[in-house]
Structure formats: C-alpha cells, structure tokens
C-alpha cells in the first residue's frame, strides 16, 4: 500500500538576518501597557551594507500575557555552581529599577522570545534569563535620528 521512497529531507531556513540586534544592548526600563511588554533600550545595533550603527529604541511584544513572563535572576554569572530565583515583573521593577539588563543572546521562535544576559546592579553583573510569551508581533520602535 505504501511505497518506500527513501528518507524525507526538510530544510528549515531562517531567511535573512534581521536588520537590528539586541546583542550588547542594555534595557533601561520594562513596562507592561495595554497587553504589550515594552523594553526601553539605551541603544540597539543595526547592520546594513556592512555598516554598524546604534539607535535609541523600544521593543514592543504585543499581546503578551504577563502571567506567562518568566524572569530568572541568578546569584552569579553562571560559570560554575549557581543559585537563583524566578520573579515576576512587579518584583523585577521594584528590586531592579536602578539596574540594567544587558542582552547577550536573543532567541525567537513561535511566539516566544528568550533574552539571556547580565543584570548589572551597582557595577556587578549576575546572569538573567527572560522568557517572553506573546501572540502578537514583536515591533522595533527605532529613533533613526
């Protein structure tokens, strides 16, 4: 009934690299407004025609359920043994209002963004991971000036 045609190959192409990168960018503030999670950055990078530029920017995750936001804050930069805690956005906003989250790695897939990096407080970094779940778009609001 079924004919063996050999192995099936599927190639997953990720297309072109995005114009903007959050790598090494620092989050100044995180807000939740009208079901959108908004990250305000001091700058993000853009790459076009071999030229790197920086821009003041906000990243908006639309239709984000705040109950599904996971923020993991560790006690070190995860080189060996570590401990940490899972906190919610209000606690992050209270405890780390004077801190900056430096994005080192950004990963996106099917309504999920994972930002990993260092949370800087008074010049001292600890590892931090933010798991963001959203059903809308991820929008770059960039000041091109």
Language model features with spans:
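Surface-exposed, interaction-prone regions used to assemble/regulate multi-protein complexes
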Residues: 2-145
């Amino acid at each position: 009934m079924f004919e063996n045609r050999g192995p099936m190959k599927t190639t997953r192409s990720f297309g072109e690299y995005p114009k903007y990168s959050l790598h090494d960018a620092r989050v100044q503030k995180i807000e939740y407004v009208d079901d959108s999670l908004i990250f305000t950055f001091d700058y993000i990078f853009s790459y076009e025609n071999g030229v790197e530029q920086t821009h003041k920017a906000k990243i908006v995750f639309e239709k984000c359920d705040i109950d599904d936001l996971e923020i993991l804050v560790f006690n070190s930069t995860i080189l060996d043994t570590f401990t940490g805690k899972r906190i919610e956005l209000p606690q992050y906003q209270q405890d780390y209002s004077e801190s900056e989250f430096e994005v080192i790695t950004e990963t996106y897939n099917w309504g999920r963004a994972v930002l990993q990096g260092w949370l800087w407080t008074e010049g001292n970094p600890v590892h931090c991971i933010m798991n963001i779940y959203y059903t809308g778009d991820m929008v770059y609001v960039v000041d091109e000036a």
